[in-house]
């Protein structure tokens, strides 16, 4: 037999002379590396780079290689040789043939040498001497490995289907009982367990494949039951450097597909660079090296669709091949035909030209290629180049050319060139010629159909090719001329995104079928769809026929949210319509171009809805009959419910208010108050926002955010903070600065702790007072004071704050009477306030702001008596009474639909304090004095932490409460007074106020100057 382009010839004799066939998510361009380009023409001709760009490399797929090596060493195969690999025979010197075949399938993509078509596949090499015994044992070995789906066979015999019947009867019996029977029995068992057998057509320049590559045809010819044909592929070689229309495109050494067209594929087999051993590469030609391209594409396809068996892999490869038709048809084929006797002994070679016309004239380019091919055959060694050219021209002349009918000529090329890119996208047709009688659907689903079944076994995958139908044309078959349908079985989702023209029904028996994966994308079915119990139909596409949803089945438009268009729809009782609304309010839809009959249950999947929403469940172009039996929902929204309604040609889902009161979910006083107020509005944006709450917790959070607690908190904090002005005046009177010009400043920070009813209140600020007094009589002082203060009050949990600017003016009086020192003051403050509330409720998100003012009046009186132990130490018990009255002007917020308003309100707070001051100095002459103060403060008036509010949009007024101070608190002070000069003093001090529910800390400084 003619060997590779390197001129190597092989001949092996065994129990019959055996012949092998050696004529020796990036874009696609990202895969065209230097490693790829060493076989760039071959790989590009089968669209390999495009298949790689879809993410496929053969990873995880096992391919058996029955050939001349049982070991694959070197970096090209490291880590991807199956543990079952080994020699069936003793190792021999033909091993490089097996290395080369394995390299075409799965040499690594490692930036070195070459890479195979399925460069991450796992390989199972089984080494033979190509004797019948070793081949049978290798096949039996594969039969014990049902996990290996693809079996590559780059070997064969020099016997052909169209000549075997010319052999003697004894020779025919010998073949039938020997190699034919062995391969039939083993091949049948492989087919039963889902393995795909891929065979080289052979290199004898024959119109038909060798006897084993064409075994299904031979079995049919002898009338032998043939159950292996659908798991069998015959591979013909072509020259990838030539255009398909060229007379030099088909390899001149290759056997073709005549009589075996239904299971024949073409693959590149001329000048293929592959591994020769563990370290080197070489160039090879032959159907031996075309066959692994088909096996490799099968591995890519198996990776894409792990649930497919060998027959189904063959279905895809055959239906997605690029046919040699039209402008792609080779205008002629030159074959170097080798002649053998019935024992495979070589006799001679001759040239044959095949075409559909009466004569062919070859171009110079074609003649150059054809001349080189003929010169490789030793039979023509004695001819000159010109004699070879003349022989080629003579065979192409009108007198000698072999003229075939168009149908017979097309059959030479089988189904066309294997196409990796199309194959990894699913079938291109459902072929009833490749179905069995058991695939007949009789009467069910409204007719008789040939049904193609696939079990996705829990995998989800996409068939994106346009799937046509091929009818059975065998008149004796029960499938004769029936439309072809698809039966989807098993768990997992099957996405159909092509424009599918098969006319039989699509039967969804298990898992889901999604017609159209994305909105505005492709995806259509020409026939009916039947969805059976526990199965689902979805998608964004178009179904021209009738969709019937049986009891227990589900319709779920979209792939998530989307709209499905159908011709007719029938919801049978017990069926489910899964209707989804997403976070943005986009909803499923069903467009029915003709008639709809509805029943069953609508199952709503809606994480959020809005009051008053109306969603269209289906639009009907024809007649709408029936009604849905019920509605279930996963919604947790506490104040809404869904109802069904109908128009003449529509079914609707309406979102309405249920009868649950808003305050049913409230857990605090403030929540209940604001909930009742919002309920009283009956409509409007605030009412709708609460009605649209996703959960009870969300509603409570909304009540908290809307309640305006900052206004109650501000009143409580302002009354509490008023003491800093009183304390500044009192300190000046106590330290005898009141008869001079004095300055008092302070900075402070405090909080009211949160309670079960209200949030934590933080307040802080700083201010100053300037006073001036003069003596009145012998022991009295009268003075005036002015000042200003900045404060910030926050309720962080309510996302609210209030900025306060205060302007103070007042007077003070101090005197001594019968050993008691009396101090008192009166102050008026004008408060300029600006509030902000961040409204964080969905549907109301905004910032509510208000500018408003208030008036604060306060006064105090204190009496104390000083006990001096000596010139250095004294104590002073004291009692203090104070009162502050806050007059809040009316106002309202702006900037939000949830804005609040209020009328004029006032409140007051009175305090009493009993305490003891202590003072110490080193001596009577010391300029430094230390002081400390501890007191018990009691609030004499009730809590003053309420404010009456209402929404600008309307509704009843309500009272909101805030956290406030405790009735009883501990007051502490400490500091130092420095006599700077005879006429100047400086006081630095700390003051704290503490109780269970509040705390305050402040630092103060006072400076006095006497003139």
Identify the residue ranges that each predicted region occupies.
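Subtilisin-like serine protease catalytic core
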Residues: 30-31, 36-39, 49-135, 146-149, ...
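Substrate-binding/access-modulating region of protease and related hydrolase catalytic domains
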Residues: 52, 57-59, 96, 108, ...
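Extracellular S/T/G-rich loop segment that most often corresponds to the catalytic His/Ser-adjacent loop
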Residues: 62, 67-70, 219-303
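Extracellular repeat-rich scaffold modules on cell surfaces
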Residues: 277-280, 287, 293, 300, ...
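Outer-membrane translocation/initiation segment of Type V secreted surface proteins
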Residues: 307, 319-468, 474, 587, ...
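Extracellular beta-solenoid/beta-roll
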Residues: 485-486, 496, 503-585, 591-601, ...
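Outer membrane beta-barrel translocator domains of Type V secretion systems
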Residues: 682-867, 871, 987-1011
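Outer membrane beta-barrel transmembrane domains
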Residues: 882, 894, 898-1011
